[in-house]
Amino acid sequence: MATQEQKIIFRKIEDVLYSYKKYVDKIKDDLKELENPQIAKRYSIDKLTGSGYVIVKSELERIEELKERLLNDITRHEEILFRIDNALEMIKDNKDYNFIEMRYFNKLSYEEIADKIGVEVRTTYRIRNNILSALEIHFKTQKLI
């Protein structure tokens, strides 16, 4: 049985794994947004105030600022995915590796996983604990938790 500290760590690892697809989708959405010709009209940053002045930015400046922000978001999300992929690569030879895909990427229930691999439901919980234990050091090394 996992200790309270292990449960907290496992929960953090699971949160990162469940978020993987969200990062992939966000990158795709941001890339589409960068290619959108209506980009300037969708985001209005007309005036900035400071030191008693009102600065009105041109449409080109607004577009460039928005593109820069989107590119920064894409870069940040790609970095997170890269670190997750590196951690997963370290355990890919683990006999229970396919549990990660079934549970966290395909969102199968423990019952569905048990049926799929032909084990008792309680065994899937043991498999989860084993695979998350194997991932723990790699997630810490990659500064994901």
Residue ranges and their predicted role:
Residues I80-R83, N94-D96, I127:
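N-terminal positioning helix adjacent to the helix-turn-helix/winged-helix DNA-binding module
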Residues E112-I117:
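Short alpha-helical "recognition helix" segments of helix-turn-helix
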Residues M1-M90, I137-I145:
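N-terminal interaction/assembly modules
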Residues T124-L135:
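DNA major-groove recognition helices of helix-turn-helix
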Residues K92-N106:
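Short amphipathic alpha helix immediately N-terminal
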Residues L88, K92-K95, T123:
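Short coil/turn residues that cap or connect secondary-structure elements
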